[in-house]
UniProtKB/Swiss-Prot annotation:
Lineage: Eukaryota, Fungi, Dikarya, Ascomycota, Pezizomycotina
One GO molecular-function entry: terpene synthase activity
Residues annotated as binding Mg(2+) 1: D91, D96
Swiss-Prot/TrEMBL site (Plays a critical role for substrate recognition) positions: D92
Family per similarity comment: Belongs to the terpene synthase family.
Protein name per UniProt: Sesquiterpene synthase MAA_08668
Site features described as Plays a critical role in the stabilization of intermediate cation, chain residue numbers: F88
The keyword Metal-binding belongs to this UniProt entry's keyword annotation: yes
Native source organism of the sequence: Metarhizium robertsii (strain ARSEF 23 / ATCC MYA-3075) (Metarhizium anisopliae (strain ARSEF 23))
Residues binding Mg(2+) 3: N230, S234, E238
E.C. numbers: 4.2.3.-
InterPro entries (UniProt xref): Isoprenoid_synthase_dom_sf (IPR008949), Terpene_cyclase-like_2 (IPR034686)
Length: 355
């Protein structure tokens, strides 16, 4: 009933555009990185059917990496692109576009945490686990130890707060905005992404600067801007998903607003975060800070603008034309792992050599 009421209002929905006062950038390696990312996803059996492969091609995750990390070295940029395609696919297949909870949900999510904690894959691995191990081992080689742990902690919180998101969808009505914001801050996947912003520019920020209260506020504002803007941009598709569909817009609608008014309320929140980020970034960079911290703040700006430009110019992930086919992944959610394990034997050998 909740979904049907929302769907009835979608045909006349107007989606606002967001702007920020700094230019976008894009790595000149974008197309090369995109092509290598597709090859890597193929080698790790992430593209489960031709239909799924075509979806990934039109989504352009490599372009997202190139826009959000324009100054990254080629090796780091490649592993980030590979991470992004892995993250979006597993988030869709494990959480968003399947039933709210399945028999495999806990096993899938704990396997992702175990790769971070133990640096090995399970036997047999779940879907995407060997690809995830490969990403983590490459990042361990490229990042300082503490910098990798920032990334890892963000991913652990993604996997664990996914359970809170599932619990929210098992309720007859959603939790309120405050609780949702807490869940969204971690299920968005933005914390692992922003944790790489310094290394992709001028090098890893020391802990004393990274954990400064103002710097963490900037990180949180970046997360909010991207996550809440995405709640608007992905609304039409998410309402058609079989499981997860509640977000900031639908929660506002649950409280009595029309869906259009709920979009405008959410957009106002996004613009307020953008204004707050701009003011605080100016204040922090006016202080005597390290080059690495300047690089981190630049990296946060790249992420905000890069994401907005990716949605506006590159990706078909949220395109109306593909909503019906892309919103429901239940037909893809259980690849035959016995076949997967046989075809992954060579991948297992190559990743184990990196330990």
């Amino acid at each position: 009933m909740e979904k049907q009421r929302l769907k009835a209002q979608l045909s006349s929905l107007r989606v606002p555009l967001f702007s920020v006062p700094w230019p976008g950038q894009c790595s000149n390696k974008a197309e090369v990185v995109e092509a290598r990312m597709m090859k890597w996803a193929d080698e790790h059996n992430l593209l489960v059917t031709d239909e799924y492969r075509n979806r990934v091609i039109r989504t352009r995750y490599g372009l997202l990496a190139a826009r959000c990390y324009p100054n990254a070295g080629e090796e780091l940029l490649q592993v980030i692109a590979d991470y992004l395609v892995w993250f979006f696919l597993t988030d869709d297949l494990f959480v968003d576009r399947v039933e709210v909870a399945t028999d495999e949900t806990i096993r899938n999510l704990t396997a992702m945490v175990d790769v971070l904690d133990l640096n090995v894959a399970g036997s047999p691995p779940v879907f995407g686990e060997l690809a995830w191990l490969d990403v983590c081992q490459r990042l361990r080689r490229l990042l300082q130890v503490e910098a990798f742990e920032r990334f890892a902690q963000g991913m652990r919180l993604w996997a664990t707060t996914a359970a809170l998101q599932i619990l929210n969808h098992l309720r007859p009505t959603s939790v309120g905005i405050q609780e949702y914001q807490t869940i969204r801050r971690h299920t968005s996947g933005m914390n692992p992404c922003t944790s790489l912003a310094d290394a992709a520019n001028k090098g890893s920020v020391q802990a004393c600067e990274f954990y400064d209260a103002d710097v963490q506020t900037l990180v949180r504002q970046t997360n909010n801007i991207v996550s809440w803007a995405n709640d608007i941009q992905s609304l039409r598709r998410e309402i058609h998903q079989p499981g997860q569909f509640r977000n900031m817009v639908t929660i506002c609608a649950q409280q009595g607003q029309s869906i259009q008014d709920s979009v405008e309320t959410t957009a106002t929140r996004v613009n307020k975060e953008i204004a707050g980020f701009c003011g605080l970034a100016d204040a922090v960079t006016a202080r005597p800070i390290s080059d690495e911290l300047h690089g981190l703040i630049d990296g946060l700006k790249y992420w905000i603008r890069g994401y907005l430009d990716w949605v506006a110019h590159d990706t078909m992930r949220y395109a109306d034309h593909f909503i019906e086919s892309d919103a429901d992944d239940r037909r893809f959610s259980a690849p035959d792992l016995s076949l997967l394990n046989k075809s992954c034997s060579s991948v297992t050998e190559s990743t184990s050599s990196l330990v």
